[in-house]
Amino acid sequence: ALIPVIAAYFGVTQVGWSVGNGGVVKLTAESALLLCAGAYIAQLAAVYILGEYINWMSRSFGVTGDESQRHYEGTALAVYSSTPMMLAGIVLIYPQLWVVASVFILAACYSVYLIYEGIPILMNIPKERGFIYASSVITVGLVLAVVVLVATVIVWGAGFGPIYTN
């Protein structure tokens, strides 16, 4: 989970980014540190909440077995399926929009694939039921992404937004 945070810190403070023909934009070290710390907390919270959701929904989809085993498997799936997104964060060293967007779209596709493949295997349910279960997990993941974006807007509006150098 530290890969995207450290890469983003380096990228926005040392490399910077540009939009169109504009100059290179960078953040101050203090501003970047605050934003990266918030991103780190948001990543960990999102993975934890997704894992808890997977565990909570297991009863609804007929998953049998020991509750502690189910809890472990749901959390493991949340961590495992978020790994491509975390590893893709290395691209934030070079924060150019088209590069970052391309890599993160590919990583998101692979994460979705891992969820669709992993739910039936880890929860020991038929693929048909696993498809619906995985679809609900992905929906919650998308809702979590929107919640993080809204929280970012609220935090920035409260005065904790980025501070640019020039």
Give the role of each language-model region.
Residues L33, A37-G38, S102, V146, ...:
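Alpha-helical hydrophobic membrane-insertion segments
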Residues A1-Q69:
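Selected alpha-helical membrane-embedding segments in polytopic membrane proteins
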